[in-house]
Every structure is written in C-alpha cells, then in structure tokens.
Amino acid sequence: MNISKIIFNSVKYPFKNLAKLPIICILFILIAIIPIGKLLDNNYVVLIGVIAFFIFILIVPGYFLNIIKVGTRESAMLPSLNLVNSIQDSIRVLILRMVYMIVPVAVFFILLSTVGSESIKMLYNFPFHGFIATFGLVILAILITYLIFEFLLFFAKARLAYLNSLPEALKVHRVIADINNIGLFNIFKWIVAMLVLMVVISIVSSWVIAIPYVGFLIDICVIIPIMESIANYSLGMLYSNIDGNSHSLVR
C-alpha cells in the first residue's frame, strides 16, 4: 500500500474540482453566521445562524460521506450536491455515531456513578495521591474506551460509504476485519502522515485567521472545507485497499 500516493492524491483532490469547490464553501458559510451575529450583537442574525447550523448538520455529514465513497472508487470527481441524498446520508451517519457511542457513554456513566458514590469514602480512607490516581485511572479508562470506538466508527463510516448499507456498517466484527485487512501498520502510517498534513494546514489556517476582518471567513469557508475534503477523500482511498481482501465484505 502506497501511503504517500494516497496523501498526494488527497491533497490534489479539492484543487482538481475548483468549479465545484464553492459548493462546500457555501455550505460552511452556514456555520459562520452565528459568530457573525455575535460580533454584530444582532440577535436576529444569531437566530438565523442557529437555523443555518441545523441545516449544516443535516447536509454536510452526508455530503462528506459521499466524498468518502468517491475516494473508495479512487475517482477524482467532487460529488454534486443532492439535498435529499445528503440529508438521508447525514441521518445514517448520525445513527451510526449514536450506536457506536453507546458503549463509551455506558462506560462513562457506570464508572463515574460507581466511583462517584464511593468518592467520599475514598477521600477519607485513601491517601490523597491514591485518590487522585484512582480518578486518573477512571478517566483514562473512559478515554481509552472512547478512542477505541471512535477509531472503529471512523472505519464503520468508510464501510457505510463503500457498501451504502447502514446494517453492514453496524457490524462491528466486519469493521474490525476491514481494519485487519487494511493492516494496522498501514493505518498507523496513514494516521501519522495525515496528522503531519493537518498540522501544516492548521499553521496556514492560523496565518489566514490573522488577516483583519476577512481572515475568519476565509478560514471557515475555504481552509476548513478543503481540509475536510482531503481527510474524507483520503479515508476513502485508504479503505479502497480492502478490495484485495474482499472476503471481509461478505454480507
């Protein structure tokens, strides 16, 4: 698997579709309305921004799922915006996230309720450093559980895009099989490469934000959409390597 090729093609991807790129930029304008309203101290603009934010949530996750799908096919085309399909896909992504977060949320409440109810006794019966260490372990356990399921969710979303099937994306054992077929070392290399790329883009973003008056808008409406397009397309390209081990896709 050529990780450098995946990253290189992903970086080029938004700029091969300059005619359609404004579609994403316009969508991201929706989330800029609330801070603009706050800056103007205008409650009407803030209200419009709240409505626009919900529209954003209904459309954008589904649209980026479509970009992942394009990446799995290794196509260079930016998908056209179909409102109905984007809303349907956004709902599927939301359901997927809710299901995959059941375990982390359950662990969070179980551990906090258990430790919380005993915290007073622990505070009196344990040395202070022991009390802090216990709470630290609880927080660490919650964090690890969350990161594991967030990682699984990442590839479940790619599976959803690839197979266009929510039930398939909810099959955790199939998602784990996909991860194994892609290869944990390949995924690790991809994550490191993407982190480096995102850090570079974030540095550029910080310079853009410093531009008076328009920097904030340029960042939200141009830099962030490009960053999201690169990340989602790259995930799709990474997942496309599952073809070589397609037995994990059996329904």
What are these language model-derived features?
Residues 5, 9, 42, 46, ...:
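Membrane-helix interfacial "entry" motifs
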Residues 19-41, 45-72, 93-128, 132, ...:
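Short, small/hydrophobic-residue-rich motifs at membrane-helix boundaries and re-entrant hairpins
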